Design a protein with these regions (language model features):
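Alpha-helical adaptor scaffolds
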Residues: 30-35, 58, 63-70, 75-125
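TPR alpha-solenoid repeat register
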Residues: 60, 94, 131, 165-169
Length: 182
């Protein structure tokens, strides 16, 4: 027992000394090139300033919309996404983000313009797992559970076994299957 304790302590001390030698040395310096990350509000302000000079920058408009959603300013995000949409109406990611922002303003329901945006995304990329997921949500909101099931089954078919979103879509599929049984 004593020998095992001594070996344990020796290995622990040895490990700490090796790790301390491997750790990067940071010299105390006021200007070491490491900046604090910007807050979401600061990021939004920088993007808005940048867009004054570059109003046609699609990626900046899309990032601004995402940041505005992140701060809960859905109305402003819809405006930013609309500007980005006018520049590039065929960007799948934008279509999904834009539709989601509009749906957030509609109590989470995908109808009207948000539905049209999802349908456009589906026509552009009917093999996209994200698009199929959203198309299933649209169908479920319209109480077309068979169509929702079809979209989600196709999405699961296209996914690898370890895909991070697989569980979410399987749960959605289970929910509508339970609704159809009742």
């Amino acid at each position: 027992l004593i020998w095992s304790m001594m070996i344990f302590l020796f290995v622990g001390v040895l490990s700490l000394s090796i790790y301390s030698q491997l750790a990067p040395k940071i010299m105390p310096n006021a200007d070491n090139g490491i900046n604090e990350p910007l807050s979401m509000t600061e990021s939004i302000n920088k993007l808005e300033s940048y867009l004054i000079e570059n109003p046609e920058d699609f990626q900046a408009l899309k990032m601004l919309g995402l940041a505005q959603v992140g701060t809960g300013n859905v109305e402003k995000s819809i405006e930013s996404f609309e500007k980005a949409f006018l520049i590039n109406p065929n960007d799948i990611d934008l279509l999904l983000q834009y539709a989601s922002a509009i749906a957030a303003n509609q109590d989470g329901k995908f109808y009207g313009k948000s539905k049209i945006l999802i349908e456009k995304a589906l026509s552009l990329d009917p093999q996209s797992i994200q698009v199929l997921y959203f198309a299933g949500i649209v169908a479920a909101h319209q109480t077309d559970l068979d169509q929702a099931r079809g979209y989600w089954q196709k999405a699961i078919y296209l996914m690898t076994e370890g895909h991070p979103d697989r569980n979410i879509i399987e749960q959605a599929l289970d929910t509508i299957l339970n609704l159809q049984v009742k």
